[in-house]
A protein has these predicted regions:
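Acidic/Ser-Thr/Pro-Gly-rich, low-complexity N-terminal segments
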Residues: 1-23
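Low-complexity segments enriched in small/polar residues
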Residues: 19-187
Length: 187
């Protein structure tokens, strides 16, 4: 006969604890990196509009036979031609770093600051181009008065204001989209 095994009673096995990891909350996405790329596009738009404005105003202020030379000199021989473009880029990058994903109103208010910064950058470049340090105080006062109401300074400020508003609208829309994505990830 074959040996029969004695059935062993089943012992209750201890239940091992199950450890669940909490899901990590979604990272707060920033608008800063992409914002700089959007500002770069805005700067190209500013440079194009600024160039057109310089061409139009220079064509009104100079005789027609001197226009090509004056236009070339406006962007290659003087600081006042290209400093507003750099000032716009720097001002908008600083604005993007500060307001990040804010709404459009923050970019509208910040655009005022950018426009004033571009205006004063042009005035400063204009004074440097005119060698203000070689002037007498009376000549400097006349030079400064002409710099404040220079049509190019006003144009630089106005164009910077408009481009900063529309670039800000683009940045705010992207920031709103990032906020919406974060809300969906939290749910």
């Amino acid at each position: 006969p074959e040996p029969t095994a004695v059935p062993v009673p089943l012992q209750p096995q201890p239940v091992a604890p199950i450890f669940l990891q909490r899901p990590e909350p979604p990272k707060r996405k920033s608008n800063r990196g992409t914002g700089i790329l959007i500002v770069l596009v805005g700067t190209v738009a500013f440079a194009l509009l600024w160039s057109v404005a310089v061409v139009v105003v220079d064509s009104l202020l100079t005789p027609s036979n001197d226009l090509p030379k004056v236009l070339l000199d406006s962007f290659t021989q003087v600081f006042a031609g290209w400093v507003p473009i750099i000032a716009f880029f720097v001002g908008m990058v600083v604005l993007v770093q500060i307001v990040n994903r804010s709404r459009w109103w923050a970019y509208i208010l910040g655009g005022l600051v950018v426009a004033v910064f571009v205006y004063f950058a042009f005035v400063g470049a204009y004074l440097v181009d005119a060698h203000y340090w070689e002037r007498t105080p009376a000549e400097f006062a006349i030079l400064l008065r002409s710099a404040w109401l220079n049509p190019f300074a006003v144009l630089a400020g106005v164009i910077a204001r408009e481009i900063s508003v529309w670039t800000g609208a683009w940045l705010a829309a992207r920031g709103r989209n990032l906020d919406h994505v974060i809300e969906l990830e939290v749910d």
